[in-house]
Amino acid sequence: MKTMESVRLISGSAHPQFAELLSKGMNIELSKCESKHFLNGETSVILGESVRSASVYIIQPTCSPNVNDNIMELLVLVDAVRRASSKHITAVIPFFGYGKQNKKEKSREPITGKLIANLIETSGVDRVISMDLEASQIQGFFNIPVDNLYAEPLIVKYIEKHYKHLGEKVVISPAVDGVKRAKLVSDKLNCDLAILDRQTKGDKEDMILVGDVSGKVAIIIGSIADTCETLALSAKILKSKGATNVFALVSHGELSGNAIETLNNSELEELVITNSIPQTEKSKQCPKLKIINVTPMFCEALKRIIHGESITAASSKFVIL
């Protein structure tokens, strides 16, 4: 059994705020590490203290706006830690970039998610901890343990706390392939489930609603909010079908491009995301945006791994799939 004295936490530059919260929750100081980019675009890291014979946890979501740089920095950090004679390396990746590219949609396409998994594993990582991977098969892309934490319990608690007084609810899956995630929430809330089937005909995009939302509070459950265009279209259709209010809760908020403007101009009452991805000051000032802190869930998982305890759903405060 490992002790906290043999554990090191190292933060990449992708999300230092997340690493700080994790450090406080674990009561372990972040190890010194300098990361920089040369003018030619190359990445360099220097460890500021010994990690010899230590179990090292590298905290680095591979997220936007610099997803490729963040991936490269993670690989370089892992190589530096491995060459410094660490005992065990865990990559803590709250958001796994390229997760959408997990299968071939057309012929002659790559499966980039698998390529990223290969790179991470080959660099020397012994274990990966992530949250709400875009597809379950991503765990199978690795030949090392992958712990996929699930934010559903925190999302359910948020709904119960903030939307309890609003009346009858219906949970919405904004896509057919997200039904399983949405059903987990609807079962916990003991409410109906409806599905929005996204259809594209030429340049025109539309959604077909399967289910009844008339006179109900519609709660969209999704995985990633990127441009927010799908969420905005979903809210418009749900309101046109008689929904009294429309809220959206998603695991990861990339909020790319004009996402904030799209959100502000949409019929969504509120968009709730987690802090798996850092947000810009512009995003933080958006009145419709709310953020759930998931670092306590990661702290619990890390503590159980360090002490050799189970982190299955039956014995933990959170869900892992």
Swiss-Prot record:
What InterPro entries does this protein map onto? Pribosyltran_N, PRibTrfase_dom, PRTase-like, Rib-P_diPkinase
Binding-site residues, Mg(2+): 132, 147
User: Which residue ranges does the record annotate as region Binding of phosphoribosylpyrophosphate?
Assistant: 214-229
Please tell me where this protein is predominantly located: cytoplasm
In terms of domain of life, where is this protein from? Eukaryota
- Write down the EC number: 2.7.6.1
**What EC class does the entry list?**
transferase
- Cofactors, names only: Mg(2+)
The cellular location(s) given in this protein's UniProt record come to:
Cytoplasm
Q: Name one GO cellular component term.
A: cytoplasm
Question: Which Pfam family, an example, fits this chain?
Answer: Pribosyltran_N
Q: Signal sequence: where?
A: none
List the PANTHER family: RIBOSE-PHOSPHATE DIPHOSPHOKINASE FAMILY MEMBER, RIBOSE-PHOSPHATE PYROPHOSPHOKINASE C
NCBIfam families reported for this sequence: PRK01259.1, ribP_PPkin
Per its record, how is this protein called by name? Ribose-phosphate pyrophosphokinase C
Protein species of origin? Dictyostelium discoideum
Q: Gene of origin? A: prsC
